[in-house]
Amino acid sequence: KLRAEDGRSVKNVDISLFIKNLPDRRDTKRFCTEDASGSTSQAAGVVEAMESGAKIFLVDEDTSATNFMIRDELMQMVVHRDQEPITPFVERVRALYDEQGISTILVAGSSGAYFHVADRVIQMDCYVPKEVTKEAKEAAAGFGEGVQALKLTPVSFDRVPKKFKTGGRDERFKMKVLGRDSLQFDRDVVELRFVEQIADTEQIAALGYLLKYAGTHFI
């Protein structure tokens, strides 16, 4: 499940598939920040999911960065593509499936921009799903050619994780569960408040022990 995570840390992630030419000239091929915006955090989340081998993305419009998801025709007329650093997800979603086999399920209620590129459109009518693909495609056809579906550009996955420093003794490396919101490794805190799939602290503890084992045995 992907969402915007304002304020999250991003370490050496290639987000150039979606974001380039930032005003401060930061390198988006190896993007780093301790305080990501909604768009940069969601771009990083997509690339990290690709790197992990995910084959389906679950996206909710309500928890996404609008400027990452869409860019309408009027905005493109005022702010030219060459002046905008963000390539919206709607222009990459088709290629993610065609070239990488990654499907996307998007819940949306305010924009029909994805009707042009969707394989299926399902309407929820009083909690009952209805197939409305034909109607959505016909309606979208009346709004011109729709979005510009772009091919994917190469993404780098050559990050090298930093080895856990245990001083040769595994017991010296401390892992602590901080409620359902975070996990602490020595002095480093892993923020988990936006990972909605986590239901209890036992899951966080299991994740912590898995990371600790991987960090001390495989990295």
Task: Give the location of each predicted region.
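Conserved P-loop NTPase nucleotide-binding/switch module
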Residues: A49-V93, Y97-E99, S110-K137
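Conserved NTP phosphate-binding and transfer environment spanning the P-loop NTPase/kinase superfamily
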Residues: D98-G101, V107-I219
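Conserved alpha-helical scaffold flanking the Walker A/P-loop in AAA+ ATPase domains
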Residues: S37-M50
